[in-house]
Swiss-Prot record:
Monomer. GO terms for molecular function: arginine-tRNA ligase activity; ATP binding. It is found in: Cytoplasm. GO terms for biological process: arginyl-tRNA aminoacylation. One of its GO terms (cellular component) is cytoplasm. It comes from Protochlamydia amoebophila (strain UWE25). The keyword Aminoacyl-tRNA synthetase applies. Its EC number is 6.1.1.19. It catalyses: tRNA(Arg) + L-arginine + ATP = L-arginyl-tRNA(Arg) + AMP + diphosphate. Its main location: cytoplasm. It comes from the Bacteria. This is Arginine--tRNA ligase. Belongs to the class-I aminoacyl-tRNA synthetase family.
Amino acid sequence: MNTLLSVLANLFQQATANAFPDLSVLDPNFQPEITPSTQEKFGHYQFNSAMKLAKLLKKNPRQVAEAIVNQLTDSLPPLSKIEIAGPGFINMTFSTDFLSKNLDILLRDAHFGIPFPEKPEKIIIDFSSPNVAKEMHVGHLRSTVIGDSLARLFEFLGHHVIRLNHLGDWGTAFGMLIAYMKEEAPNVLSGEQKTDLTHLVSWYRSSKKKFDEEPEFKRRAQLEVVALQQGEQKAREAWQMICEISQKAYQEIYQLLDVKIIDRGESFYNPFLPNIVSDLEKKGLVKISDGAKCIFLEGFQNREGENLPLMIQKSDGGYNYDTTDMAAIYHRIYHEKGDRLIYITDAGQATHFQMIFKAAEKAKYLDTTQIRVDHVPFGLVLGTDGKKFRTRSGETEKLIDLLRTAINCADKILSEKNPEMEESERRHLAKSLGIGAIKYADLSCNRVGDYTFSYDRMLRFEGNTAAFLMYAYVRIAGIKRRLKANLPAVLENTHINLEHSTEIELGLHILRFHETLNLMANDLLPNRLTDYLYTLAEKFNAFFRDCRVEGTPQQNTRLLLCEATAKVLKQGLTILGLTTVDKM
């Protein structure tokens, strides 16, 4: 089943070609610009290309519009109305029969009438990526939930997705930490004493202070880095233990968030680094700057106008994240055979990734005509005071504490709303609502901007919130329970028949699900989907207000419209990483 947008695009492409045969010479790549109408009085969609065509064809825009409409008279079956407005806009309204039939297809098809791609792509998404021996904080929440929602989207659309956790698990920090633990926690290194991430974080902070202040400790830490790089057994065992403790703590968060991801840290790429540097040198891309091997790229300067370096080898012979990211992009293209690479990090790393992509192109690793690469930047999480979100003591909020607080807040709200609810059921609901509220609050903001974190706001049952959408789903589940309907039998014997204006509005919006997913897949903005779902819930509430379901001649057809709404709502929330519940 085609999207409504593509149905119209095909109609107008043909009508325009028939009306103006010379257009194929004047603009061989002409594509009609069609957008959803902003107001109900302008129909369902609007054709906006008449002005552009008028300039090309040297005609009056309204005459252009009239010529196109004249060619559409034989194509009216999907459309009930075509009107020319203003200087040449063409407003279109789909027939209720066409919409009803397409809703029947969506409702009965397991994949919503959305065709699977003829050639699925391999899409590699790099997200979350905390630094080992450090707590995950609210910034990691953004990368994690945005990355997970995009992965779920592409999986639903039928692509093969590899979810990678590019852990910061290598470098000087480990030398510092191992050297410090040898002095302060030898029993932990020997395996006699257990520890956790909280202790590792504390030791890391102390080791950093010591590294900055004590030259002798700095020397010992650097020796530990060398030992680690050379594969010495004791150093490797200490490193392995630190990684495992960190990953165990991260896994608790991923389980709470219902996020699946493959750990593949910086250390994975270590064997490839010397060859990458050598290859870049052979290709004449490397220049020596202050003893370091650097790549300088056009268009990347600092505030003083000096060229920014992509440093692929430090003056002491060591490697850094520039080298690792060059190795990673090479590996993802040549070893993983990725068709599309997506990196999700804070906006502060945008220049770094633009430079990596440009350098990969110059090195002939990346051919952007064959492989699409995207850096997906996101803004900061702010507190209600407008400053970077922190605890009351000024510390960065631990992500695990944030999630537990959201669950507890949701539990309190549910206790107040429904004191008779069984505790086990309430705790289950509180988890779905609390985690869902945090995810949705993040995803419903345009990721490029900053957003303000507020438990109170995100857990409200009104407005564009997870609770509002989850409650719309609960409402439909309640309708089905009250009617005790045999849904398979209703599906077999009844077809949707849109009559009332709010039925038509709801049905039209349901059928825009596919084109919404296409938009999100292209610009990687999850708020495309949250906006769609919020409008869906609002349109359902308007339908429910105006159109009685139970005990009317239209009971079964309206029940099917409720079911189509619930089906899309559930799938949309699943793509965002939220779970639906039948009761609340």
